[in-house]
Amino acid sequence: PKVSSERRQFIPIGYFDPTTLASDLLFIVPGAGSYELGMLSSSMHNAWMRTTAGRLESRYRYSVHVVYNNFPWPGDVSAAKREAVESAARAILTARAAHPDSTLSDLYDPDAMPDDLRDAHRALDKAVDATYGYRGGKDDATRVAFLFERYQALAGLGLASANPRKRNRG
């Protein structure tokens, strides 16, 4: 969704059949599979989103141009690590399906999120963290610092290695 509650730990993301028309309040990722679903459903991506997204009142306002296009995806990912993310993403879908009377909004209510769905997200985070080689903390600040370092490397900014300018003390 373009706008999501600030109370949610994860933005509810899912698949829809080809006959579904997306409104201007949804984003679509054509050709996305389980790997993309997993990456976008992870704490890593959600930490990035909470830092880079705009706001509509206090809710997060997701942007393709700012959040998605600038998200520093992991580099070369082995087939085994990719499969681990895909499998964990499918487990999230399975956990959601176990609650057929609940909407995505219901499932991602932080006060009512089912334990099996929360556990599936924990397993996904472990798999996604492994794709990055991330061994830092589980808090957003540590994740975002890691992602910004990756972003700088991908963008070729080399800010950490830039020569500092000498001050003119004259």
What are these regions (language model features)?
Residues 1-87, 91, 154, 162-170:
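Polybasic, glycine- and aromatic-enriched phosphate-binding surface used to engage nucleic acids
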Residues 68, 72-170:
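Non-catalytic DNA-recognition/assembly elements of restriction-modification systems
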